[in-house]
Amino acid sequence: MNIFRILGDVSHLLAIIILLLKMWKSKSCAGISGKSQLLFALVFTTRYLDLFTVFISPYNTVMKIIFLACAYVTVYLIYGKLRKSYDSENDTFRLEFLLVPVIGLSFLENYEFTPLEILWTFSIYLESVAILPQLFMISKTGEAESITTHYLFFLGLYRVLYLANWIWRYHTEKFYDQIAVVSGVVQTIFYFDFFYLYVTKVLKGKKLSLPMPV
């Protein structure tokens, strides 16, 4: 396992911790897209169905359990404990616009036509677009809290580091996972504008704001 994957996992975990701490301390989930969090929970669920049948390493197993647990806790807080603060009026992205094409693509483009492999492929494709409801929500409200932007930054950084991981693995092991790499590139592209605003505004102490949709 190379340093890029480790740093990617740390960045991913840090993003989730930032989000959970934000909700726990403020007793509010305002500004957080419950739909994006539902998609991420679905991503981890379909990707880690082999949790109890395939063992790679203690690190791999522990990280799977942590990500699954955090995903379900996040969904519970948004739709359960903190549901009164959930901004459902602005979290209006149509999930079927993502789920239908992702499901179709998972059946058409995969490495092996078996249930577990199709579900794994589904999770990779879905993760690449799961953040769209959150970005749509920010564009709809016109702004985002600083904690939410930090969460999105580390989530985007995780994808960039994982792309570096794939490049490193190809260079050192001649290993290339086309589905994971292409999906990772697509996901990273969605963060480009956000990264620019994060560096030019948030890191300078300014509030991140986006043009309101017409």
Curated annotation (Swiss-Prot):
GO molecular function: ER retention sequence binding; KDEL sequence binding
Compartment(s): Endoplasmic reticulum membrane; Golgi apparatus membrane; Cytoplasmic vesicle, COPI-coated vesicle membrane
Pfam short name (any one): ER_lumen_recept
Region listing for Important for recycling of cargo proteins with the sequence motif K-D-E-L from the Golgi to the endoplasmic reticulum, in residue ranges: 204-207
Gene Ontology CC entries for this record: cis-Golgi network; COPI-coated vesicle membrane; endoplasmic reticulum; endoplasmic reticulum membrane; Golgi membrane
Lumenal side, ranges: 1-4, 53-58, 111-116, 169-178
Segments on the Cytoplasmic face: 25-32, 80-92, 136-149, 200-214
InterPro entries: ER_ret_rcpt
Disulfide cross-links: none
Broad class of where this protein is predominantly found: endoplasmic reticulum
Similarity annotation: Belongs to the ERD2 family.
Biological role stated in the UniProt entry: Receptor for the C-terminal sequence motif K-D-E-L that is present on endoplasmic reticulum resident proteins and that mediates their recycling from the Golgi back to the endoplasmic reticulum.
Descriptive protein name: ER lumen protein-retaining receptor 3
